Amino acid sequence: MTILEKNIQALLSGVNEPLGNKLLNFIQNKTCSRFNIDENLNIYDKTHNVFMYENLEEEINFFYQSILEKTHRYPFACIYGIGNALLIKNLSKHYKHLFIFESEIELFILALSVIDLSEELYSGKIYLADIEEERVDIQLLILFDMKDISEYLSLYEMFVNNVYYKKFYEDIWHKADELCEKNIKVVIRNLGSNSDLSFECYSHLLQNIPSMLESIPFQRILSERKNKFDNTIVVSAGPS
């Protein structure tokens, strides 16, 4: 069994049958005409006459470090673009779930032909989302409603796989981002929370952390002002 067949089999096991069937139908009736992949796993785009990676190793390492720094200890991450799947494979060990969004069927085919993601697909660690799938909204609602995801939806951010996607797929990347935000708001609303308020509170927390860390520690306030006043009023907001 080839790597591609193993990956498709994993998708067809119930992980993402629509995508599995779409890939199976493609390899049975078509061939990749726009993209190809070389022995170094660099992908060539015949339409724009460019390679996906100018320096494959450096670029993958840069985005690997950049995404990890911004999602330290996050239970999940969302990335637009499967690329050659090396970045996805490397990042998967750091998260409970990794959601990968892609619009090009040929890029799914090429990536899944060279990198074995079957174990991660079977376990749910990696989920491949075809944003051209007509039922993608339903898929995302189910995924984002999982308990180990729904509790952390305010952490959501869409990252991009590499510079190539930023340059040639900006509109589709934003479409995927809007798709996720729309479904996240539905999930949070169904949980009884105000999604806009949730995102706003998280934004305020990040903005105020520097000043909070620089503020006078509460124990120091007590030691400096003990017995100097008859009454004290403590004003606090948010979780303590």
Name each model-derived stretch.
Residues 1-233, 239-240:
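N-terminal donor/sugar-recognition subdomains of glycan-related enzymes
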